[in-house]
Regions:
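SAM-dependent methyltransferase catalytic region
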Residues: 1-188
Length: 188
């Protein structure tokens, strides 16, 4: 499965100039790194595992982790949530997620959210402690978020002003939000 996703990712990389990807902080994870990162997780001993990949890109990290979890654990069901906003990469991601679903059909549920991950979680992140609301939490977060500095007036910086000190970096904000979205016994 991962081989097919690597192929579509390589085709995308060849079609999209590096300077354009660099402008939006888009640097894709290599196949070897994705497999290595997936190997680091201790898979929870439960029947239903939730995985979050904020800023999914082409889905290579998700694919490596899902393959690791489901290939050797026949009694596990995975719910994978992917966030991606880049209109150029979305068709590639959708194709890759469709391929993943075709391989692991009844053991994998995929939720693709075409929205800004940080802004979508901002209300939960900033909620008043007296409000009765429960933020969505995941068992595992795997991510290679965009890497770039942003201004303090950027919507993501303003949404997470509690953790913005000095020059904000989108990578840091993604990781801070992912930590917020992690179950207490979860892994990042």
């Amino acid at each position: 499965m991962l081989f097919n996703i690597i192929k579509t990712t390589m085709a995308y990389l060849e079609s999209m100039p590096k300077k354009d990807r660099k402008k939006i902080g888009q640097f894709f994870t290599s196949a070897n790194t994705a497999q290595y990162m997936a190997s680091l997780f201790k898979i929870p001993n439960k029947e239903h595992i939730t995985i979050l990949d904020p800023g999914t890109g082409t889905g290579i990290l998700s694919a490596a982790l899902v393959e690791r979890v489901l290939k050797y654990n026949e009694n596990i069901f995975v719910e994978l949530t992917c966030y991606e906003v880049d209109e150029n990469v979305l068709p590639v991601l959708q194709e890759n997620l469709h391929h993943m679903k075709s391989v692991y059909d009844d053991r994998l549920d995929i939720i693709l959210k075409q929205e800004d991950y940080i802004l979508s979680q901002a209300d939960d992140f900033n909620h008043d402690i007296f409000e009765d609301r429960e933020a969505k939490k995941w068992d595992i977060v795997i991510s290679n978020p965009p890497y770039m500095k942003i201004e303090k007036k950027h919507p993501a910086s303003m949404a997470m002003s509690k953790v913005v000190h000095g020059s904000p970096n989108l990578y840091f904000l993604f990781m801070s939000m992912a930590l917020f979205n992690l179950r207490p016994d979860g892994e990042m």
